[in-house]
Amino acid sequence: MRIISYNVNGIRAAIKKGFFDWLKTNPADVICLQETKATQGDVDVKQLEALGYHHYWYSAQKKGYSGVAVFTKIKPDNVQYGTGHKLSDDEGRVIQLDFKDVRLINAYFPSGTSGDLRQTFKYEWLDEMNKYLNKLRKKTTKLILCGDYNIAHTE
């Protein structure tokens, strides 16, 4: 399974810059996108489908903010949206896909750059994510975590 993880910083802007042309030439089975800043309805998904991709979107409730998506040529057995952590789930930060014995998690970790409240939220999110991942590790040995980790000491 070949996987690409890519923070697009807005899927609509990426499309304007040739994202679909790039998709036609890449050899990946699975493409995990972070910071999509859009819903599925904001994108011409017929182009994805014509290239053989199944697509799964988890968007933030706040329009134009955050969000993750996975485009895959391999149909997953199961898709789970979110982790059950409400604040995180409202921001569309985690999507999980199961492929036979492999569990893939695409995550957009929060940044703490916009002040103390967001830094506190980030630490809480990291604690919740760690608990979530530890639970998953007990259920499967083949766990792939990809995404934008936004990890820097002061961010």
Which residues fall in each region the model found?
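A long, amphipathic alpha-helix that forms part
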Residues: Q119-T140
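Active-site-proximal beta-strand elements of phosphoester/diester hydrolases
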Residues: M1-N9, D101-T113, C146
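N-terminal, active-site-proximal structural segment of metallo-dependent hydrolase catalytic domains
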Residues: M1-A50, H54, Y65-S66, Y81
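Surface-exposed cleft-lining segments at the edges of enzyme active sites
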Residues: G84-H85, P110-L126
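Short gly/ser/thr-rich secondary-structure transition/capping motifs
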Residues: I11-I15, H85-D89, D127
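Nucleotide phosphate-binding site architecture
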Residues: R12, D77, A152
